[in-house]
Amino acid sequence: MALLSFERKYRVRGGTLVGGDLFDFWVGPFYVGFFGVTTAFFALLGTILIFWGASQQGTFNPWLINIAPPDLSYGLGLAPLLEGGLWQIITICATGAFISWALREVEICRKLGMGYHVPFGFAAAIIAYMTLVIFRPLLMGAWGHGFPYGIFSHLDWVSNVGYAYLHFHYNPAHMLAVTLFFTTTLALALHGGLILSACNPEKGEEAKTPDHEDTFFRDFIGYSVGTLGIHRLGYLLAINAGLWSAICIIISGPVWTAGWPEWWNWWLDMPIWGEPIAVIGGM
């Protein structure tokens, strides 16, 4: 693949975190680096193990493949390969691949002299994943509390965890996470729609300027966060959506063991409600 006109001057040595110049090269448009190699290794090994696990189950139906965590009786110990050990190895591979990918992003940022906003944003998603399969099981004393790798089995796990706390949507951190996901979608959909409407004119028309974009939102809601501000806002919303997702699950079990509706009893017990007001004169 041919380089774009400006790419060659940015393809310089240096900026690596590990390995020096050993893996400091590109394959086509893709920068490799040491962490590109480790990403490929972990991703390939994890994928092969998933398919091997599927072969042991006798199905390659993507809906039915299920790589389950060990039984709770194994606690935090190692399980036999076909009794949860495979899940443990695949979890290591997935974690290694995700972290390697983030560190590869760091190396690219260092080469270009950019900030680390992209790897930090990706780190929020990694933390959410690790909370589900590492941090929460550690706090609850068994790897069996992690979620299985499979489409239907994963959905069953989500349903079972929800019912274990009666109504999971009463979890206040879950409320925040869902709100942030929807708000992120709304903010970036509005932003994307605005840019397309301003910068993708019909044939023969001129593209509009950022002043048009700012004026639209001032007319629309009375305020414009600005062309840079909308990206800061979207970044903040998206990161918080991932982090509050991690918080909502890690407090379910290690911190709060009852049904989530019971958590709201503090609201009913607040003194502001007081005693019922007596009716005067039968009115």
From Swiss-Prot:
Function, in words: The reaction center is a membrane-bound complex that mediates the initial photochemical event in the electron transfer process of photosynthesis.
Record: residues binding (7R,8Z)-bacteriochlorophyll b: 154, 174
What family is this protein classified in?
Answer: Belongs to the reaction center PufL/M/PsbA/D family.
- Biological processes, Gene Ontology terms: photosynthetic electron transport in photosystem II
Membrane topology, as annotated, equals: Multi-pass membrane protein
Which gene is the coding source of this polypeptide chain?
Answer: pufL
Note the subunit structure. Reaction center is composed of four bacteriochlorophylls, two bacteriopheophytins, two ubiquinones, one iron, and three highly hydrophobic polypeptide chains (designated L, M, and H).
Q: Does the keyword Repeat apply?
A: no
**Binding, a ubiquinone:** 217
* CC per GO annotation: plasma membrane light-harvesting complex; plasma membrane-derived chromatophore membrane
Q: Name the Pfam families for this protein.
A: Photo_RC
The UniProt entry, under InterPro entries, shows: Photo_II_D1/D2_sf (IPR036854), Photo_RC_L (IPR005871), Photo_RC_L/M (IPR000484), Photo_RC_L/M_CS (IPR055265)
Q: In the record, what lineage is assigned to the organism producing the protein?
A: Bacteria, Pseudomonadati, Pseudomonadota, Alphaproteobacteria, Rhodobacterales
Q: Which GO terms describe its molecular function?
A: bacteriochlorophyll binding; electron transporter, transferring electrons within the cyclic electron transport pathway of photosynthesis activity; metal ion binding
Q: Where are the transmembrane segments?
A: 33-56, 85-113, 116-141, 171-200, 226-252
UniProt entry keywords in alphabetical sequence: Bacteriochlorophyll, Chlorophyll, Chromophore, Electron transport, Iron, Magnesium, Membrane, Metal-binding, Photosynthesis, Reaction center, Transmembrane, Transmembrane helix, Transport
Q: Where in the cell is it found?
A: Cellular chromatophore membrane
Q: Which PROSITE patterns match?
A: REACTION_CENTER
- Name of the protein this chain belongs to: Reaction center protein L chain
Which residues of the sequence carry a binding annotation for Fe cation?
191, 231
